From Swiss-Prot:
One Pfam entry name: TruB_N
Broad EC category: isomerase
Gene: truB
Protein name: tRNA pseudouridine synthase B
Species for this entry: Citrobacter koseri (strain ATCC BAA-895 / CDC 4225-83 / SGSC4696)
GO biological process, one term: mRNA pseudouridine synthesis
Function per UniProt: Responsible for synthesis of pseudouridine from uracil-55 in the psi GC loop of transfer RNAs.
CDD domains: PseudoU_synth_EcTruB (cd02573), PUA_TruB_bacterial (cd21152)
InterPro entries xrefs: PsdUridine_synth_cat_dom_sf, PsdUridine_synth_N, PUA-like_sf, PUA_sf, tRNA_psdUridine_synth_TruB, tRNA_sdUridine_synth_fam1_C, TruB_C
Keyword Isomerase in annotation: yes
Statement: the UniProt record of this protein carries the keyword Iron: no
GO MF annotation terms: RNA binding; tRNA pseudouridine(55) synthase activity
Membership in a protein family: Belongs to the pseudouridine synthase TruB family. Type 1 subfamily.
Amino acid sequence: MSRPRRRGRDIHGVLLLDKPQGMSSNDVLQKVKRIYNANRAGHTGALDPLATGMLPICLGEATKFSQYLLDSDKRYRVIARLGQRTDTSDADGQIVQERPVTFSAEQLAAALETFRGDIEQIPSMYSALKYQGKKLYEYARQGIEVPREARPITVYELLFIRHEGDELELEVHCSKGTYIRTIIDDLGEKLGCGAHVIFLRRLAVSKYPVDRMVTLEQLRELVEQAERQDIPAAQLLDPLLMPMDSPASDYPVVNLPLTSSVYFKNGNPVRTTGVPLEGLVRVTEGDDEKFIGMGEIDDEGRVAPRRLVVEYPA
């Protein structure tokens, strides 16, 4: 007879993890899930093993709203190695071409300018995007290249930090779907020398406060501290979580009276005052404005439920 699966506890919120280098985003996710003993967990856009920085991890009911963070802006610090191109566009790949670095400061400035604003980007073969139901990196590992369509992205800000020898450091504020490795690879080709990423740190996701980031080591230390104090680890861990609706913080709020929210929570569109003309909204209820889910304004101006909170912390 097989043992019953361990369910974990109902804990809801978003942990802003400072991902360490050399670990996959999924490995980090599983460690956080175990530390919190959470019944559900999911991240909001993977970071490459080489990369460090902000990785929002959603626990419990917050996983329902992680999709809204996938659409948010990101900010990165990146260091590129000039003169070498790799098959993965980063230091984890194999060098496929080496060329001298001969561009001038003026040529660099002109090249950087072409990556600012609304541009189109062809994703790397080493990405998790799918082609005919299979991830691109699975084809790449078999030595197969498949067609990829250019996708529109926006680079809101591309800051030059330094150029020393064969290293170039930049800061990038960009829209969803932007591959920093691809920007560096494309920039290297435009400069005629090739380039690949040797350091990448995600500085920010959406409007999350950077000072709320924590490391795996800090989480483990809190667990050990709780053991020494003979208290539940949750007393020290749970205050680190951001609210479960924080992934959707960019959307306007509609507060429903309790007389209307009961219908909304049962899956029915409701009418109320002070709603926008269209689009998605965060829906709260009552005087304490408890978050109950995401809604969308329908053609009749009603708030229609889209994603509802089923469980809620007591």
